[in-house]
A protein has these predicted regions:
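Hydrophobic alpha-helical segments
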Residues: 1-118
Length: 118
């Protein structure tokens, strides 16, 4: 269940961080291993709401993108909205932790100018 959502979180967090290495790496996983089409990939890069996920997963994705872009903008209203979509606190935490870890990876790869090796 979580393979596509996790790869989508990594991809779209990397888009916000302008990490070309991770964008291309995660795009490759989505396209070559998880069945996402090139059209779906481009659509979700333009707007996370276009990701080929169910509503619960999409809500978590949009929340993570908001939080990694401006963590101070997250409020209890956001958390309650996720809970109303049947997201557990563990799922909310796990999704955001996944996104936050991706930010740190993006920073490292960008700072050290790591070139694509794939």
């Amino acid at each position: 269940m979580w393979y596509v959502p996790y790869s989508t979180i990594r991809l779209l967090v990397s888009v916000t961080q302008h990490c070309e290495y991770c964008i291309d790496f995660n795009a490759g996983i989505l396209l070559n291993q998880l069945g996402v089409t090139p059209e779906q990939l481009e659509a979700m890069k333009q707007n996370p709401e276009n990701a080929p996920l169910n509503e619960k997963e999409k809500s978590l994705l949009v929340f993570v993108i908001k939080a990694v872009s401006d963590s101070n903008s997250v409020s209890e209203v956001d958390i309650q909205a996720l809970r109303r979509k049947d997201c557990t606190d563990l799922e909310i935490f796990d999704a955001l932790a996944h996104g936050a870890r991706q930010v740190s990876g993006d920073i490292l790869l960008n700072a050290f100018k790591v070139e694509k090796d794939f």
